[in-house]
Amino acid sequence: MRKSGFFPRLALVNLMRNGRFYGPYLLSCGMTAAMYYILSYLTFSDIVASVRGAGYLQSLMYLGRLVVTLFSAVLLLYANSFVMKRRRRELGLYNILGLEKRHTARLMVWETLYCAAAAIVGGLAAGVLLSKLVLLLLLQLSHLPVEYGFEISLSGMADTAALFGFLFLLTLVWNLFGLLRSRPVELLHSASAGEREPRTRRLLVVLGAVTLGAGYATALTVEDPFTALAYFFLAVALVMVGTYCLFTAGSIALLKHLRNSPRYYYQPKHFTAVAGLLYRMKQNAVGLANICILSTMVLVTVSTTVSLYAGLEGALERMYPYDVDVVQSLDEVPPEQETTLNEDTLERVQAAAADAGRKVELLQWSTPGDTVGYYTGNTFTLVAQEGVSTEIRLLTADDYGRLTGHTVDLEPEEVLVQAENLDLPDTFYIEDLPFHIAGTIMDFPRYNSSILISGQTAQLFLVVADETVVSAISDRDASRVHREFRVQVDLDGTEEEKLAFVDPLLAADANDVYSVISHQDNAVNLYTMYGGFLFLGVFLGLLFLLSTVLIIYYKQISEGYEDQRRYQIMQQVGMSPREVRSSIRSQVLLVFFLPLVTAGIHVAAAFPMLCKLLELFNLFDVCLFALCAAGTLLVFCAIYALVYGLTTRTYSRIVGGQ
């Protein structure tokens, strides 16, 4: 026993002999280690730090590292618990054959060292090899210039080795703790230990139905983006609780109902499948719920990020309809100086275009105003209170006519209205000022907005008679109506040439002379942000998919070993191999596709809420999101079916004793 090299050799033999268990375990550990290194590399990369919009990318990659850290811990602990459960009989035999617990502990230490070395070294090697390819993909998605060269992140390698070294140490401590508390006889029989038939817990079924229904109702009845944001995590929590309750208690109730149906139950393929699932449903239900939740996470994460990226051009056109929007605040400007200041701002814009050698294709200006009102009944109150929070934008008839070419003549109490998410009567009030709707319009001038997330619940665009009406509204607003002079410009030339026009204006913007909102400048930032969203969404989707596949694989292996003796007995009492295969197919179909169908239902129920959340990022194209969600579901189903085929063969080989 004291010969050096005995335990290292025995540990290596054990790992190779149990390759069916340790192979997927080490592959998953290595893949998560590679993913963690790649995200660390992108977080600390000098190449990423040098590109425009680096702050967005590095923040997103850091967030991704946190998610991968959490899932790596869960994945390793889950896989380790499965592997050790399958090996308990083997460890018990070691004790019966003369090995003491301290010897078994040494064996576990060596096995953990081998696993850690293989996973960390393999993961780092794969991460280093793939890091440049992933970086090029990220830069391409973000519309950033491709940087050539190769670098290795030593800090990323150190972080990866430290994290996974700690996780393997944690699994070792857990395994040793279980070994110390066990007895040899328990280890010999634990792998085949069954469970009592679970009872039908009606209270849990009711709780699951109520929480799932409440989560669905919350998602289906949400009316505006900010309410969706406020209740999103509550809805997620309710659906998760409902899923676990119904899979745990509801599945048992369903199986017992099937057992009480003689026409269905007393068929060999159904009899063995239902009886087996019912006997071990407590364990199976949690695994099925985990698969369902992870599948839902994959579908939601990938579909939302893909749709955001696909709808980016539309969002840019809505947020930045002009190449350049120069904004001069008039809040602190005396009325007698407004004309001079406005003319000076207009001259600066024209001079910048001349200096850049650009032809001005569109030049227009106006003096809009905006405030926030809270609509109740037929009145907007300009002090925060209960009511529909509404962004109110004001434009005089003269400015509206100059911008649109439509001449309008309004009385002081008349307005033209364009409303979004708001229904108004023919006469409404702003504080005590009455306004009569003289007509509705659909062409209220748009302005560039530097705000990514949408503003208030509703928007109201008003064309008023003249500045006296704006002043009257401002007098009733404690915070005053925000007034500004805006110059919109469209230019000829390439994107780079338009950015060159913006640079001197941005320099003046830095001195607080005025603010400049550039379509091209913000397009760079948004492509960086949305490209990072898409990259991270797909990256995390792969992580969730890996977790799903691993749980499915281990679950089916566990089922196969537990069913092996049962099916052998069934063949001995008269079942044909064809009947055995049919019964296996019936059980595997139920185990596999119930979580997938449920995940699809979850996504369908969440669709209205997700649409509202996407509106916060200026994605209003519901059809686009529906297509992206459907495409994601189809791809996921194809992968799911592939895993199903592979797992069915593995399950069949185990049951057949191969």
Spell out what each predicted region is:
Residues 315-546:
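Basic-flanked hydrophobic alpha-helices used for secretion and membrane insertion
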Residues 41-54, 124-156, 214-230, 595-657:
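Short helix-loop junctions at transmembrane helix boundaries
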Residues 1-6, 181-195, 561-562, 652-658:
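Short cytosolic juxtamembrane segments of multi-pass membrane proteins
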Residues 114-258:
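Hydrophobic alpha-helical segments
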Residues 35-63, 233, 249-252, 285, ...:
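Alpha-helical transmembrane segments
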Residues 1-33, 197-202, 211, 246-295, ...:
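N-terminal Sec/SRP start-transfer signal
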Residues 20-27, 35-67, 82-85, 93-94, ...:
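Peri-transmembrane interface segments
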